[in-house]
C-alpha cells in the first residue's frame, strides 16, 4: 500500500445518490482539518452548513429536494462538541435513509503528536480537554469517535499532508468531473481614496496621460468609448496590457497550484474615473478567455468625484 493509499482509505465505491441531493457528513478529530475540508467542498460548489443541529439536517435536505431548489450537494460539519455526538450521527443516517438518501461520511484524523503540535502552535485548548492535559483530551476524543471512524466512507489522515495536499485529496474524492474554477476580480480605484484592502496585486496606471485634462473627455468615465479609445491609444498602453496579461496568467497558474481560488487585481489611477476604469475593462476582457477562470469587474470609486 502506498503512502497515498494509507492516507486515504476509501471503503468501497460510493455512488452519488439517485434522490436528487448528495449529502456528505464531515467529521473527525479536532485539529485534523475539518474546516479546511469544508472550505474545499464550498469551493467545489457544495452548500456547507457548520454544526447544524441534527434535527435540522433533514429539514435542509427537504429544502434541497423541493422544486426549484439550487441545493444539490449538501455538506454538514459535525463535531464531538455536540451532546450525544455518536448517537446523533447514527440518527441522522437512519433518518436520511427513510428518504432514500445514503449520506457519505468523511472522517479527518491525524496522529497524536501532530495534533498536539497544531494545538500548541495555535495556543488553543482541546474541546474535550477540560481540566486534563491536551494529550488526554485528544485520547478521549479518539476513543469517542472510534465507532464513527470505523463506519466512515472515507478516512483521510492529514498527519503528513499540507493544506494544499488535503485540498487535492478532497477535490479528487468529491469534485467528480467538476474542476474548481478560479475567480478573478479586476478592480479599478483612485489612489486619492486609498488602496483597496482586499487587493492581492496592485498596478499603477498613472504612467498614462490623464483624460481629465482633455475638456471633451473630463465629464465621461473610462467606460465611455471616447475615453477608452484615448487611454488605449496612448503609446505603451497596448504593450502594457499584453505584458501584464501574460504575467497574470503565470500568477493565476501559481495560485491554482497553491490552492488559491480567488484573487483581486487592483488597477489604480488618480481618481479612479478614467485610466484605471478603461484599463480594468480591457484587462478583464483579455482574462475572460482563460480556461476555468471567471472574471468580474468592479469600479470601486466610480461616481465619487
UniProtKB/Swiss-Prot annotation:
Name of the featured protein: Nucleotide-binding protein Mkms_2443
Highest classification ranks of the organism: Bacteria, Bacillati, Actinomycetota, Actinomycetes, Mycobacteriales
Domain of life: Bacteria
Keyword GTP-binding belongs to the record: yes
GO molecular function, one term: GTP binding
Binding locations of GTP: 79-82
Keywords of the record: ATP-binding, GTP-binding, Nucleotide-binding
Record-stated family: Belongs to the RapZ-like family.
Function: Displays ATPase and GTPase activities.
Pfam families registered for this protein in UniProt: PapZ_C, RapZ-like_N
Binding-site list for ATP: 28-35
Amino acid at each position: 500500500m502506498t503512502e497515498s493509499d494509507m492516507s486515504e482509505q476509501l471503503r468501497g465505491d460510493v455512488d452519488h445518490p439517485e434522490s436528487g441531493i448528495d449529502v456528505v457528513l464531515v467529521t473527525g478529530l479536532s485539529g485534523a482539518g475539518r474546516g479546511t475540508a469544508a472550505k474545499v467542498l464550498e469551493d467545489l460548489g457544495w452548500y456547507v452548513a457548520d454544526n447544524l443541529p441534527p434535527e435540522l439536517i433533514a429539514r435542509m435536505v427537504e429544502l434541497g429536494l423541493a422544486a426549484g431548489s439550487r441545493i444539490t450537494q449538501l455538506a454538514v460539519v459535525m463535531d464531538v462538541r455536540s451532546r450525544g455526538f455518536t448517537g446523533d450521527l447514527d440518527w441522522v443516517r437512519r433518518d436520511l435513509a427513510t428518504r432514500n438518501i445514503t449520506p457519505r461520511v468523511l472522517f479527518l484524523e491525524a496522529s497524536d503528536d501532530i495534533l498536539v503540535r497544531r494545538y500548541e502552535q495555535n495556543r488553543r485548548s482541546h474541546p474535550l480537554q477540560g481540566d486534563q492535559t491536551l494529550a488526554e483530551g485528544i485520547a478521549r476524543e479518539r476513543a469517542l469517535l472510534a465507532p464513527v471512524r470505523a463506519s466512515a466512507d472515507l478516512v483521510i489522515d492529514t498527519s503528513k499532508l499540507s493544506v494544499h495536499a488535503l485540498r487535492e485529496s478532497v477535490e479528487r474524492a468529491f469534485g467528480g468531473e467538476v474542476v474548481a474554477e478560479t475567480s478573478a476580480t479586476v478592480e479599478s480605484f483612485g489612489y486619492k481614496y486609498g488602496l483597496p484592502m482586499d487587493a492581492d496585486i496592485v498596478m499603477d496606471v498613472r504612467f498614462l496621460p490623464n483624460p481629465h485634462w482633455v475638456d471633451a473627455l473630463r465629464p465621461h468615465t473610462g467606460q465611455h468609448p471616447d475615453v477608452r479609445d484615448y487611454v488605449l491609444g496612448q503609446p505603451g498602453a497596448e504593450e502594457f496590457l499584453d505584458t501584464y496579461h501574460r504575467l497574470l496568467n503565470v500568477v493565476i497558474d501559481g495560485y491554482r497550484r497553491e490552492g488559491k481560488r480567488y484573487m483581486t487585481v487592483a488597477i489604480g489611477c488618480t481618481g479612479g474615473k478614467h485610466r484605471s476604469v478603461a484599463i480594468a475593462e480591457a484587462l478583464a476582457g483579455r482574462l475572460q478567455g482563460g480556461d476555468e477562470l471567471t472574471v468580474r469587474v468592479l469600479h470601486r470609486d466610480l461616481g465619487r468625484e
